[in-house]
UniProtKB/Swiss-Prot annotation:
The gene is gtfA. The lineage of its organism: Bacteria, Bacillati, Bacillota, Bacilli, Lactobacillales. The keyword Membrane applies. This is UDP-N-acetylglucosamine--peptide N-acetylglucosaminyltransferase GtfA subunit. GO terms for cellular component: cytoplasm; plasma membrane; protein N-acetylglucosaminyltransferase complex. It holds the Pfam family Glycos_transf_1. N-acetyl-D-glucosamine binds at residues 241, 404-407. It is found in: Cytoplasm; Cell membrane. Keywords: Cell membrane, Cytoplasm, Glycosyltransferase, Membrane, Nucleotide-binding, Transferase. One of its GO terms (molecular function) is nucleotide binding.
Length: 506
């Protein structure tokens, strides 16, 4: 039995989906269940191994679509600059170094080889670009050996990618991809595939799936049809990570599904089970399937994360009046609302501090808001860090998100005993915040009024720190968190796998 977890991408600032998969990988290891995590995006700027290892996966758990058809294994980049130099056929005339970029110039040739190292102090090669007459013609990508090459044709608007060649360990060609804008044709010795979707289907065919295997769809945009067509005898389950429908566009007769789940829901008769993270979402989904589609699919509730232990630290040992939030710095997380709230609350409690963990596209905007309010001395952007032992140094957690399918950081926050202030929205906040017991759920009125919301957050921040029972709220967070300890989630997954696969040895 193998559980194949299907996703698209992963990055340094990963989303909750990737963190949910990382938690799941730990559970499957403890259950002794073989699990593979398949990523189907193209990775050019970073070796996928660095990204998956960073979040907690083991190398032998990872399948990358593009190296699946080669004999390469997932491994950290180790190809050295010396190895590359030994491969040059022309004598080096001179070199130029700028940070982690080294350029080689050759005697009597217009060829320039530009090398991107892992970092400035490293001699490990990540990518090599070949320029001829100042025009880009090829890029090579490395891990412990050359993984693939890209070939470019010069055009007026810049270099145009037209081909990728993927290699085996001995340097032989495994297959080629002909690229025409967004379209690709994949050429193998034995077959030709006319789309990426067909490539995914071919991978599943090669896996020779049996009725003891399971495919868990975490993300399936653009590949859902290929999965259902090529699943063989394997079971298929869909993991719902977010709000699954558009509330404002749904009425008594029509529902608008979240486009990430529309294909799966529309083909629910081909899905063996759905998984949500909360009982509330499970009930909502079951009711909606019955009402709008007149079907009764199997829906399980399994939290996407779990806690290995409660991170204990007494309230008075934490930094006084300290707040934090942790998320991607994205517009839907509404960190700007929280910054403005803390600025307002700071006028009442000047000792307040607010640390914001995470990275993302909103970083510059948020930094400007902090600077505009002259709040640099008490509001900080902390970047992306491992927070497992950080939460317990703080006293209160803030959540500005208007929708969380589960909210892993919320779970981690209460696991460290933090009261939480957040909006009264499904599903994470309503799962981890019990109003007045371990924090506050702020009523949300639509459309959102950012100023009113920030003011409400400020008022609740002040109220919480002035509360005489704040230590009780701190302890109540631990009480809620105990429901999400590893043993409980392991039992949930064990029950699910036994039932779905009819395998009671798990």
């Amino acid at each position: 039995m193998v559980v194949y977890n299907l996703n698209r991408g992963i990055g340094w600032a990963s989303s909750g989906v990737e963190y949910a998969q990382a938690y799941r990988s730990e559970v499957f290891r403890k259950l002794g269940v073989e699990a593979k995590f398949i990523f189907t995006d193209m990775f050019q700027n970073e070796n996928i191994e660095h990204l998956t290892r960073n979040i907690g996966f083991e190398d032998n758990e990872i399948i990358w679509l593009y190296t699946f058809f080669t004999d390469l294994t997932i491994a950290a980049t180790s190809y050295s600059l010396q190895q590359l130099k030994e491969s040059f056929s022309l004598p080096i005339d001179r070199t130029e170094k700028n940070g982690k970029i080294i350029s080689f110039f050759f005697k009597g040739s217009s060829i320039v080889v530009t090398v991107m190292l892992n970092d400035e102090s490293s001699n490990i090669v990540q990518r090599v670009e070949y320029l001829m007459g100042g025009k880009l013609v090829r890029k090579d990508y490395y891990s412990y050996t050359k993984m693939f090459s890209e070939y470019y044709a010069p055009e007026d608007i810049g270099p145009c990618l037209y081909q990728r060649t993927f290699y085996n360990e001995d340097g032989s060609v495994a297959y080629e991809e002909n690229v025409d804008g967004e379209n690709s044709i994949f050429k193998f010795k034995e077959t030709i595939l006319y789309s990426k979707e067909e490539l995914v289907g071919y991978m599943l065919e090669k896996l020779q799936l049996t009725n003891s295997d399971l495919i868990l769809l975490d993300r399936s945009t653009g590949i859902g049809q290929a999965v259902l067509r090529n699943k063989g005898n394997a079971k298929v389950a869909v993991v719902v990570h977010a709000e699954h429908y558009n509330v404002s566009a749904t009425d008594e007769t029509t529902i608008l599904w979240n486009n990430y789940y529309d294909y799966q829901f529309s083909n629910a008769d081909s899905i063996d089970a759905f998984i949500t993270s909360t009982e509330t979402q499970t009930k909502t989904l079951i009711d909606q399937f019955k009402k709008y589609l007149n079907i009764e699919p199997v829906v399980y509730t399994i939290p996407v994360g779990s806690l290995s232990k409660l991170q204990r630290k007494e309230w008075h040992e934490r930094k006084a009046f300290s707040l934090l939030t942790c998320s991607r710095l994205a517009s839907e997380k509404h960190i700007d609302w929280l910054i403005n709230a803390v600025v307002e609350a700071n006028k009442v409690i000047p000792e307040l501090t607010f640390d914001i963990y995470g990275e993302g596209g909103e970083r510059q905007k948020l930094q400007e808001i902090i600077a505009k309010n002259k709040a640099n001395n008490y509001i900080r952007l902390m970047g992306h860090k491992n927070l497992s032992s950080v939460y317990k140094d703080y006293q209160v957690y803030l959540s500005g998100s208007t929708s969380e399918g589960f909210g892993l950081t919320l779970m981690e926050a209460i696991g460290s005993g933090l009261p939480i202030i957040g909006l009264d929205v499904p599903y994470g906040n309503q799962t981890f915040i019990e109003n007045n017991l371990n924090g506050y759920l702020i009523p949300r009125e639509t459309p959102d009024n950012p100023q009113q919301i920030s003011t409400a957050f400020a008022q609740y921040i002040v109220a919480l720190f002035n509360s005489k029972d704040i230590c009780k709220k701190h302890e109540y967070s631990y009480r809620i968190a105990s429901r999400f300890l590893n043993d409980k989630i392991i039992e949930n997954w064990s029950f699910f796998l036994r039932r779905l696969l009819n395998d009671y040895t798990i």
